[in-house]
Amino acid sequence: MTNRIELSGVVAKALVRSQSPSGVKHCHFWLEHRSTMVEADLPRQVFCRLPVVVSGARSEALTQNLVQGSSILVSGFLAYQTSRNGVGKLVLHADKISQI
């Protein structure tokens, strides 16, 4: 099975940093993507807003220069998460971030 995604976009909301009870650092933010893709030989406007999380010791180094409005390229994998209120969503777990 393959689960790998690369998506460019803009940091849509301010970063939120947290730490788990076991001491793992996390950085959460929303990535907003807009592009024009070709589907069935026709141009299609694409828009999505996706939550991103960066975890572990490298989270601060990967996100230290990010602010709301930063244009970035994010690589990682997708995972389904269910919130405390039972609402589920796909989350991009990033392991590489570069500014563009």
Swiss-Prot record:
What GO biological process terms does the UniProt entry carry, in alphabetical order? DNA replication; DNA replication, synthesis of primer
Any idea which GO molecular function terms this record carries? enzyme activator activity; single-stranded DNA binding
Name listed for the protein in its UniProt record:
Replication restart protein PriB
- What Pfam families is this protein classified in? SSB_1
- Membrane-spanning parts: none
The UniProt record lists the SSB domain at: 1-100
Instruction: Name the family the entry cites.
Output: Belongs to the PriB family.
**Oligomeric and partner information:** Homodimer. Interacts with PriA and DnaT. Component of the replication restart primosome. Primosome assembly occurs via a 'hand-off' mechanism. PriA binds to replication forks, subsequently PriB then DnaT bind; DnaT then displaces ssDNA to generate the helicase loading substrate.
**Which InterPro entries does the UniProt entry name for this protein?**
NA-bd_OB-fold, Primosome_PriB/ssb, Prisomal_replication_PriB
Recite the UniProt keywords alphabetically: DNA replication, DNA-binding, Primosome
- Gene Ontology, cellular component aspect: nucleoid; primosome complex
Superkingdom of origin organism: Bacteria
Asked if the record carries the keyword Nucleus, the reply is no
Q: What does this protein do?
A: Involved in the restart of stalled replication forks, which reloads the replicative helicase on sites other than the origin of replication; the PriA-PriB pathway is the major replication restart pathway. During primosome assembly it facilitates complex formation between PriA and DnaT on DNA; stabilizes PriA on DNA. Stimulates the DNA unwinding activity of PriA helicase.
